[in-house]
Amino acid sequence: MKLKFEKNLDHQSKAVKNTVSVFDELHVQSPKKQGAECINPKVDKNSYAYERNIRELQKAQEIDTRYCDARSNIIDVMMETGTGKTYTYTKTIFELNKALGIFKFVIVVPTLSIKAGTLSFLKSESARSHFMDDYSKTIEVHIVESQKSSKGNKSGFPPAVRSFVEATATQNKIQVLLINAGMLNSDTMQKTFDQTLFDRY
């Protein structure tokens, strides 16, 4: 069964617009070093515009402007349950790609069940065709799973992490690494590997 998403719901559109507006007038620099085709552009958040944009949003939403740390990389977007958070942050991904050229994103979810639901949404034909109509792009999902160690074999990076890191910018793909929070401190992500991400032989 193919679902049809209702476009431009006001509360979702505002969340997307406000998030993207944090980066208004910030300098975006394309990477020039080796492997540049695999690297997101660099957004200069050290400019005055970054803090100004956040403070203007806080004032518009009647949020205490004391809660603004211009040195932080964290932007806290709060939405109530049942308001379409997964759809909203997915649309935000497409809009950030459109505005800034960012093509790699990491989605960290709290539980395995939410991870499964997120994966189901991102890979559904309904979502793919919906966003394809608006942006002429699709999302390629790299799913980080726990790895069982095998004695005697070389230990390599999780395949999803490697494929995500090595993915290059293309006209019609956005790369997303999907991981649950528990995996961040798991053996899979903490151990030392016998190979680096860019080892070929």
Predicted regions and their residues:
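RecA-like P-loop NTPase motor core of helicase/translocase proteins
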Residues: M1-Y201
